Amino acid sequence: MSDLYAVIGNPVAHSKSPLIHAGFARQSGQDVRYEAILAPLDGFVETVAAFRQRGGKGANVTVPFKLEAHTLSSCLTERAKAAGAVNTLVFGADDILGDNTDGAGLVRDVAVNLGYALDDRRVLLMGAGGAARGVIRPLLEHEPAALVIANRTPQKADDLQRLFASSGNVLSAAYEDLRGQEFDLVINATSASLQGDLPPLPKGIFAGASLAYDMMYGKGLTSFLQFAQQQGAARLADGIGMLVEQAAESFFLWRGIRPETEPVIGMLRSSLGSP
Protein backbone atom coordinates (compact mmCIF):
# COMPACT_ATOMS: atom_id res chain seq x y z
CA MET A 1 0.00 0.00 0.00
CA SER A 2 1.35 3.41 -0.99
CA ASP A 3 2.44 5.87 1.70
CA LEU A 4 0.13 8.87 1.66
CA TYR A 5 1.16 12.55 1.51
CA ALA A 6 -0.68 15.72 0.53
CA VAL A 7 -0.60 19.46 0.08
CA ILE A 8 -3.20 21.29 2.16
CA GLY A 9 -4.37 24.79 1.25
CA ASN A 10 -7.22 27.05 0.18
CA PRO A 11 -7.23 27.42 -2.77
CA VAL A 12 -5.26 24.34 -3.74
CA ALA A 13 -6.53 23.16 -7.15
CA HIS A 14 -3.78 25.16 -8.89
CA SER A 15 -0.99 23.50 -6.88
CA LYS A 16 1.85 21.89 -8.83
CA SER A 17 2.96 19.87 -5.80
CA PRO A 18 1.19 16.62 -6.83
CA LEU A 19 2.88 16.79 -10.24
CA ILE A 20 6.28 17.49 -8.68
CA HIS A 21 6.09 14.74 -6.07
CA ALA A 22 4.82 12.22 -8.63
CA GLY A 23 7.98 13.00 -10.61
CA PHE A 24 10.16 12.50 -7.53
CA ALA A 25 8.43 9.19 -6.71
CA ARG A 26 8.88 7.82 -10.25
CA GLN A 27 12.53 8.73 -10.40
CA SER A 28 13.37 7.33 -6.94
CA GLY A 29 11.16 4.24 -7.06
CA GLN A 30 9.30 5.29 -3.91
CA ASP A 31 5.79 3.91 -3.45
CA VAL A 32 4.00 7.10 -2.47
CA ARG A 33 0.68 8.72 -3.27
CA TYR A 34 0.35 12.50 -3.09
CA GLU A 35 -2.90 14.43 -3.27
CA ALA A 36 -4.21 17.98 -2.98
CA ILE A 37 -6.64 18.69 -0.13
CA LEU A 38 -8.84 21.78 0.05
CA ALA A 39 -9.25 22.72 3.71
CA PRO A 40 -12.03 25.05 4.91
CA LEU A 41 -10.61 28.41 5.97
CA ASP A 42 -11.71 27.67 9.54
CA GLY A 43 -10.94 23.96 9.45
CA PHE A 44 -7.20 23.44 8.96
CA VAL A 45 -6.58 21.58 12.23
CA GLU A 46 -9.54 19.27 11.62
CA THR A 47 -8.38 18.62 8.05
CA VAL A 48 -4.91 17.62 9.24
CA ALA A 49 -6.39 15.33 11.91
CA ALA A 50 -8.64 13.62 9.35
CA PHE A 51 -5.71 13.18 6.97
CA ARG A 52 -3.61 11.56 9.72
CA GLN A 53 -6.49 9.21 10.53
CA ARG A 54 -6.50 8.12 6.88
CA GLY A 55 -2.85 7.15 7.27
CA GLY A 56 -1.15 10.34 6.08
CA LYS A 57 2.59 10.34 6.74
CA GLY A 58 3.27 14.02 6.09
CA ALA A 59 1.96 17.11 4.36
CA ASN A 60 2.96 20.29 2.63
CA VAL A 61 1.09 23.39 3.74
CA THR A 62 0.37 26.36 1.52
CA VAL A 63 -1.56 29.62 1.86
CA PRO A 64 -3.26 30.60 4.06
CA PHE A 65 -2.35 27.95 6.65
CA LYS A 66 1.42 28.25 7.21
CA LEU A 67 1.00 30.14 10.49
CA GLU A 68 -1.59 27.66 11.74
CA ALA A 69 0.76 24.82 10.82
CA HIS A 70 3.45 26.50 12.91
CA THR A 71 1.09 26.58 15.90
CA LEU A 72 -0.08 23.01 15.33
CA SER A 73 3.44 21.55 15.28
CA SER A 74 4.52 19.93 18.54
CA CYS A 75 8.19 20.51 17.65
CA LEU A 76 9.87 22.87 15.20
CA THR A 77 13.14 22.88 13.29
CA GLU A 78 15.42 25.88 13.76
CA ARG A 79 14.61 27.17 10.28
CA ALA A 80 10.87 26.89 10.99
CA LYS A 81 11.37 28.89 14.19
CA ALA A 82 13.27 31.56 12.25
CA ALA A 83 10.65 31.65 9.48
CA GLY A 84 7.76 31.87 11.92
CA ALA A 85 5.79 29.64 9.56
CA VAL A 86 5.66 25.98 8.52
CA ASN A 87 5.26 24.56 5.02
CA THR A 88 6.14 20.92 5.77
CA LEU A 89 4.67 18.59 8.39
CA VAL A 90 6.15 15.22 9.34
CA PHE A 91 3.75 13.03 11.31
CA GLY A 92 5.17 10.86 14.08
CA ALA A 93 3.21 8.42 16.20
CA ASP A 94 2.54 11.02 18.88
CA ASP A 95 3.92 14.28 17.51
CA ILE A 96 4.06 16.59 14.51
CA LEU A 97 7.38 18.02 13.32
CA GLY A 98 7.07 21.37 11.58
CA ASP A 99 9.70 22.56 9.11
CA ASN A 100 10.07 25.33 6.56
CA THR A 101 11.85 24.40 3.32
CA ASP A 102 11.19 27.63 1.38
CA GLY A 103 14.51 29.29 2.20
CA ALA A 104 16.49 26.15 1.47
CA GLY A 105 14.67 25.87 -1.85
CA LEU A 106 15.48 29.45 -2.85
CA VAL A 107 19.15 29.24 -1.86
CA ARG A 108 19.66 25.91 -3.62
CA ASP A 109 18.05 27.22 -6.81
CA VAL A 110 20.19 30.37 -6.79
CA ALA A 111 23.50 28.84 -5.68
CA VAL A 112 23.34 25.41 -7.34
CA ASN A 113 20.93 25.49 -10.29
CA LEU A 114 21.82 29.03 -11.35
CA GLY A 115 25.42 28.85 -10.13
CA TYR A 116 25.17 32.29 -8.53
CA ALA A 117 27.40 32.61 -5.45
CA LEU A 118 25.80 34.58 -2.63
CA ASP A 119 28.85 35.40 -0.53
CA ASP A 120 29.90 39.07 -0.53
CA ARG A 121 26.90 40.04 -2.70
CA ARG A 122 24.63 43.00 -2.06
CA VAL A 123 21.16 41.48 -1.85
CA LEU A 124 17.85 43.34 -2.02
CA LEU A 125 14.81 41.46 -0.70
CA MET A 126 11.49 43.06 -1.62
CA GLY A 127 8.63 42.36 0.75
CA ALA A 128 8.31 41.79 4.48
CA GLY A 129 5.62 39.13 4.68
CA GLY A 130 5.89 35.42 5.31
CA ALA A 131 7.60 34.66 1.99
CA ALA A 132 10.36 37.15 2.77
CA ARG A 133 10.80 36.11 6.40
CA GLY A 134 11.14 32.46 5.41
CA VAL A 135 14.23 33.05 3.27
CA ILE A 136 16.21 35.59 5.34
CA ARG A 137 18.09 33.16 7.62
CA PRO A 138 19.12 30.80 4.76
CA LEU A 139 20.33 33.79 2.71
CA LEU A 140 22.37 35.15 5.62
CA GLU A 141 24.01 31.75 6.14
CA HIS A 142 25.77 32.35 2.80
CA GLU A 143 27.29 35.58 4.16
CA PRO A 144 26.24 38.25 1.67
CA ALA A 145 27.93 41.64 2.07
CA ALA A 146 24.53 43.09 2.96
CA LEU A 147 20.89 42.07 2.89
CA VAL A 148 18.51 45.01 2.50
CA ILE A 149 14.80 44.42 3.18
CA ALA A 150 12.52 46.90 1.39
CA ASN A 151 8.77 47.17 1.86
CA ARG A 152 5.90 49.52 1.05
CA THR A 153 5.27 49.71 4.80
CA PRO A 154 8.77 50.48 6.14
CA GLN A 155 7.81 49.51 9.70
CA LYS A 156 7.39 45.88 8.63
CA ALA A 157 10.87 45.90 7.06
CA ASP A 158 12.24 47.44 10.27
CA ASP A 159 10.63 44.66 12.33
CA LEU A 160 12.32 41.97 10.22
CA GLN A 161 15.64 43.81 10.37
CA ARG A 162 15.54 43.79 14.17
CA LEU A 163 14.52 40.13 14.24
CA PHE A 164 17.52 39.00 12.16
CA ALA A 165 20.09 41.68 13.06
CA SER A 166 22.21 39.22 15.04
CA SER A 167 22.46 36.83 12.07
CA GLY A 168 24.26 39.10 9.62
CA ASN A 169 24.43 42.53 8.01
CA VAL A 170 20.70 43.17 7.64
CA LEU A 171 19.31 46.60 6.76
CA SER A 172 15.79 47.88 6.18
CA ALA A 173 14.59 50.54 3.77
CA ALA A 174 11.61 52.19 2.16
CA TYR A 175 11.63 51.89 -1.63
CA GLU A 176 12.44 55.57 -2.08
CA ASP A 177 15.56 55.05 0.07
CA LEU A 178 16.99 52.73 -2.59
CA ARG A 179 17.57 55.51 -5.11
CA GLY A 180 21.24 55.61 -6.08
CA GLN A 181 22.01 52.13 -4.72
CA GLU A 182 22.97 49.05 -6.77
CA PHE A 183 22.43 45.38 -5.92
CA ASP A 184 23.89 42.13 -7.20
CA LEU A 185 20.81 40.05 -6.41
CA VAL A 186 17.28 41.46 -6.31
CA ILE A 187 14.60 39.09 -5.00
CA ASN A 188 10.88 39.78 -5.34
CA ALA A 189 9.16 38.14 -2.36
CA THR A 190 5.94 40.12 -2.86
CA SER A 191 2.84 38.81 -4.61
CA ALA A 192 2.67 41.88 -6.87
CA SER A 193 3.51 39.83 -9.97
CA LEU A 194 0.33 37.80 -9.55
CA GLN A 195 -1.65 40.97 -10.30
CA GLY A 196 0.77 42.12 -12.99
CA ASP A 197 1.89 44.81 -10.56
CA LEU A 198 5.34 45.94 -9.48
CA PRO A 199 6.87 47.23 -6.23
CA PRO A 200 7.81 50.94 -6.59
CA LEU A 201 11.46 50.31 -7.43
CA PRO A 202 13.67 53.20 -8.53
CA LYS A 203 15.60 52.84 -11.75
CA GLY A 204 19.26 51.89 -11.73
CA ILE A 205 19.26 49.35 -8.90
CA PHE A 206 20.73 46.46 -10.88
CA ALA A 207 24.52 46.13 -10.74
CA GLY A 208 26.51 44.98 -13.77
CA ALA A 209 26.38 41.20 -13.18
CA SER A 210 23.08 41.21 -11.34
CA LEU A 211 20.49 38.46 -11.00
CA ALA A 212 16.80 39.37 -10.78
CA TYR A 213 14.78 36.64 -9.05
CA ASP A 214 10.99 36.52 -8.74
CA MET A 215 9.48 33.96 -6.36
CA MET A 216 6.36 34.06 -8.53
CA TYR A 217 6.14 32.39 -11.94
CA GLY A 218 3.90 32.15 -14.98
CA LYS A 219 3.91 31.34 -18.68
CA GLY A 220 6.08 34.31 -19.59
CA LEU A 221 8.20 36.84 -17.77
CA THR A 222 6.54 38.31 -14.69
CA SER A 223 6.05 42.07 -14.47
CA PHE A 224 9.08 42.32 -12.16
CA LEU A 225 11.31 40.33 -14.51
CA GLN A 226 10.17 42.47 -17.45
CA PHE A 227 11.18 45.57 -15.47
CA ALA A 228 14.51 43.97 -14.55
CA GLN A 229 15.21 43.11 -18.18
CA GLN A 230 14.47 46.68 -19.24
CA GLN A 231 16.74 47.96 -16.46
CA GLY A 232 19.69 45.87 -17.59
CA ALA A 233 19.72 42.95 -15.14
CA ALA A 234 22.25 40.44 -16.46
CA ARG A 235 20.19 37.36 -15.55
CA LEU A 236 16.53 36.64 -14.89
CA ALA A 237 14.95 33.77 -12.93
CA ASP A 238 11.41 32.96 -11.84
CA GLY A 239 10.27 30.87 -8.89
CA ILE A 240 9.83 27.49 -10.60
CA GLY A 241 13.25 26.29 -9.46
CA MET A 242 12.53 27.37 -5.88
CA LEU A 243 9.17 25.59 -5.98
CA VAL A 244 10.77 22.32 -7.05
CA GLU A 245 13.74 22.65 -4.68
CA GLN A 246 11.60 23.29 -1.60
CA ALA A 247 9.51 20.26 -2.59
CA ALA A 248 12.69 18.17 -2.91
CA GLU A 249 13.67 19.22 0.60
CA SER A 250 10.25 18.08 1.87
CA PHE A 251 10.62 14.77 0.01
CA PHE A 252 14.01 14.27 1.66
CA LEU A 253 12.50 14.89 5.11
CA TRP A 254 9.80 12.31 4.49
CA ARG A 255 11.70 9.63 2.56
CA GLY A 256 15.39 10.13 3.35
CA ILE A 257 16.14 10.42 -0.38
CA ARG A 258 17.17 13.60 -2.16
CA PRO A 259 15.63 13.53 -5.65
CA GLU A 260 17.17 14.92 -8.82
CA THR A 261 15.44 18.24 -9.40
CA GLU A 262 16.66 19.22 -12.87
CA PRO A 263 14.38 16.85 -14.84
CA VAL A 264 11.37 17.82 -12.71
CA ILE A 265 12.08 21.54 -13.22
CA GLY A 266 12.23 20.88 -16.98
CA MET A 267 9.00 18.89 -16.90
CA LEU A 268 7.22 21.62 -14.94
CA ARG A 269 8.43 24.34 -17.31
CA SER A 270 7.16 22.34 -20.27
CA SER A 271 3.76 21.84 -18.64
CA LEU A 272 3.46 25.57 -17.95
CA GLY A 273 4.87 26.70 -21.28
CA SER A 274 7.40 28.73 -19.27
CA PRO A 275 10.70 29.90 -20.82
UniProtKB/Swiss-Prot annotation:
It catalyses: shikimate + NADP(+) = 3-dehydroshikimate + NADPH + H(+). Pathway: Metabolic intermediate biosynthesis; chorismate biosynthesis; chorismate from D-erythrose 4-phosphate and phosphoenolpyruvate: step 4/7. Its EC number is 1.1.1.25. SUPFAM superfamilies: Aminoacid dehydrogenase-like, N-terminal domain, NAD(P)-binding Rossmann-fold domains. It comes from the Bacteria. NCBIfam families: aroE, PRK00258.1-2. This is Shikimate dehydrogenase (NADP(+)). It comes from Nitrosospira multiformis (strain ATCC 25196 / NCIMB 11849 / C 71).
